[in-house]
Swiss-Prot record:
InterPro entries: CECR6/TMEM121, TMEM121. It comes from Mus musculus (Mouse). Its main location: membrane. It holds the Pfam family CECR6_TMEM121. It is found in: Membrane. This is Transmembrane protein 121. May play a role in MAPK signaling.
Length: 318
């Protein structure tokens, strides 16, 4: 498939978010080391950033070229590459904070690191989806329904980042070593995979996107984020007496469990009661893409009714 010319604003904004967050992470890594080791770390991160920038120079242009299409394949590649490198740097920052003496590290710097991740990671995901560039999503109701589903993805990303932030924000955590490693790499894996699942659902739907049919991500999110996060936070409070557990995100997970359960029940009812003619009508292209000239009526037969939007089509075009 030949891609259209890239959207320069989208390419510049995506590159700015990625390289800006990477530069701040590099500053944390360099600042955490002293003496001759600081020079070595500085050289390593500079070489890594140059290699990453060479790859980003091509992938970001491909992402900007496909942003006006219904495909998001290059967006998934860029997301995977970004999170893979970002989390490696974050792991070393976390280990440096853990090795520091109690109270030696600035708590404001730890909060600033969490704030940076909370803005850049969900923000980059929404940039890669580029809902405002989807010109084929014409109806306001369908666009807002899709925006609401993407907002749930952003909330899940914030939930995972909050679980990771509980490892480095307090000066000293009460979790054992195996629990810290399990928590970090579990969130790492979900940050890599779940947004790619959401992007693949958007890509597979094509131009005739139907948000009510995008059920793979809600199922995975319900099992891997909402259920596991509630159990993990409850175990931290009950077993390890961890007072840093976010009660707000526990409430978010409970609300998400109830909301998604209702969504699944409603979806099953709609699939069971959906009439086949209405389903076929929903899969047809919009009236604006059809031939506006009606076919000539037969010589011997009833007159052909004029073409126009049907009530069923209006009800299903959400």
């Amino acid at each position: 498939m030949v891609l259209p010319p890239p959207d320069r604003r989208h390419v510049c904004l995506t590159t700015l978010v990625i390289m800006g967050s990477m530069a701040v992470m590099d500053a944390y890594l360099v600042e955490q080391n002293q003496g001759p080791r600081k020079i070595g770390v500085c050289i390593i991160v500079l070489v890594g950033d140059v290699c990453f920038l060479l790859v980003l120079r091509y992938v970001a242009v491909w992402v900007g070229a496909e942003v006006r299409t219904a495909k998001r394949g290059y967006a998934m590649i860029l997301w995977f590459l970004y999170i893979f490198v970002l989390e490696i740097k974050l792991y070393f920052i976390f280990q440096n904070y853990k090795a520091a003496r109690r109270g030696a590290a600035d708590p404001v710097a730890r909060k600033a690191l969490t704030l940076l991740l909370s803005v850049c990671v969900p923000g980059l995901f929404l940039l890669l989806v580029a809902l405002d560039r989807m010109e084929y999503v014409r109806t306001f109701r369908k666009r807002e329904d899709l925006r609401g589903r993407l907002f749930w993805v952003a909330l899940d990303l914030l939930d995972l980042l909050d679980m990771q932030a509980n490892l480095w924000e307090p000066p000293r955590t009460g979790l054992p070593l195996w629990a810290e490693g399990l928590t970090f790499f579990y969130c790492y894996m979900l940050l890599l995979v779940l947004p790619c699942v959401a992007l693949s659902e958007v890509s597979m739907q094509g131009e005739h996107i139907a948000p009510q049919k995008m059920m793979l991500y809600p199922v995975l999110s319900l099992a891997t984020v909402n259920v596991v996060a509630v159990l993990a936070r409850a175990a931290n409070m009950a077993l390890f007496r961890d007072s840093r557990v976010s009660a707000i995100f526990v409430g978010k997970n409970v609300v998400a469990l109830a909301t998604k359960a209702c969504t699944f029940l409603e979806y099953r009812r709609q699939v069971r009661d959906f009439p086949p003619p209405a389903l076929a009508l929903e899969l047809q292209p919009p009236p604006s893409q059809r031939n506006s000239v009606p076919p000539p009526p037969p010589l011997h037969g009833p007159p052909v009714r004029p073409h126009g939007p049907s009530p069923t089509r209006d009800a299903l075009d959400t």
